[in-house]
């Protein structure tokens, strides 16, 4: 696991160099089992979808040393919705429900194997300040696309601050960077921060909106949301 190491220490370490060499030799690394199963069944995989990514230039597949072009950041586990398909690993609000109603949490987990409001075994990884500093120094200057998700990516000041930091950093050319969002699109500003003055500094913005039905179905499934708004 690279969880205790900085991104720049992991990207080109011996383990990842070996993975690239295996892929060049048409060998499946053990950590790629999900993509292997999907592709051998004739389905698209995360790997094949990434290869068709139109927002980044083609990598140099012959080199063992790479520069990251496509970066994914999850800046928060908080969300302003409590969607019924989600759980505490991706939404801290569900974990709070479990703490507030421990009897219900225990009953759901023990009798129904329903752990959506239990403390998650693994939470999504939120980058620390040390990780962000490393990314700005060693990764982001070469990046061509950054995807923000969460939680709800617009529901944290850290996302807006990260965009502003990129704009202010002389080593980062934001006009070469496309922004990608996976969002419920219920907000574009948060606690005095807004994307409106920030987005024009970037090459482009691509937004995927989670909807899941209309009208009353939307309001039921996406608890906390209002379809009319």
Pin down the residues of each PLM region:
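Accessory C-terminal segments flanking Radical SAM cores
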Residues: 1-53
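Juxtamembrane luminal stem/stalk of type II transmembrane Golgi/ER carbohydrate-processing enzymes
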Residues: 29, 34, 49-66, 105-118
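C-type cytochrome heme c attachment motif
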Residues: 33-34, 81-85
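Detector for the c-type heme attachment site
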Residues: 36-38, 86-92
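Short cysteine/histidine-rich zinc-coordinating motifs and their immediately flanking basic loops
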Residues: 43-58, 91, 95-99
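A Trp-anchored, charged/polar loop motif used as the substrate-binding/catalytic surface
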Residues: 54-62, 125-137
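Core AdoMet radical
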Residues: 68-78, 89-127, 141-157, 169-191, ...
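Short, well-ordered amphipathic alpha-helices
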Residues: 132, 159-168, 192-196
């Amino acid at each position: 696991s690279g969880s205790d190491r900085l991104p720049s220490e992991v990207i080109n370490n011996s383990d990842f160099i070996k993975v690239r060499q295996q892929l060049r030799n048409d060998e499946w690394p053990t950590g790629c089992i999900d993509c292997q199963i999907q592709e051998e069944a004739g389905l698209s995989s995360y790997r094949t979808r990434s290869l068709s990514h139109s927002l980044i230039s083609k990598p140099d597949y012959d080199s063992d040393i790479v520069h990251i072009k496509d970066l994914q950041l999850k800046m928060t586990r908080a969300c302003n919705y409590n969607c019924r398909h989600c759980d505490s690993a991706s939404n801290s609000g569900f974990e709070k429900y479990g703490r507030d109603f421990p009897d219900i949490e225990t009953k759901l987990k023990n009798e129904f194997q329903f752990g959506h409001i239990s403390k998650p075994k693994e939470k999504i990884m939120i980058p620390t300040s040390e990780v962000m500093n490393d990314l700005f120094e060693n990764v982001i200057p070469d990046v061509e696309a950054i995807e923000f998700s969460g939680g709800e990516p617009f529901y944290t000041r850290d996302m807006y601050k990260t965009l502003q930091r990129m704009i202010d950093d002389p080593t980062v050319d934001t006009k070469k960077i496309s922004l990608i969002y996976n969002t419920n699109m219920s907000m574009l500003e948060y606690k005095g921060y807004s994307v409106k003055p920030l987005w024009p500094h970037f090459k482009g913005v691509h937004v995927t909106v989670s909807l899941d039905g209309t009208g009353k179905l939307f309001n039921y499934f996406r608890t906390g949301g209002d379809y009319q708004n």
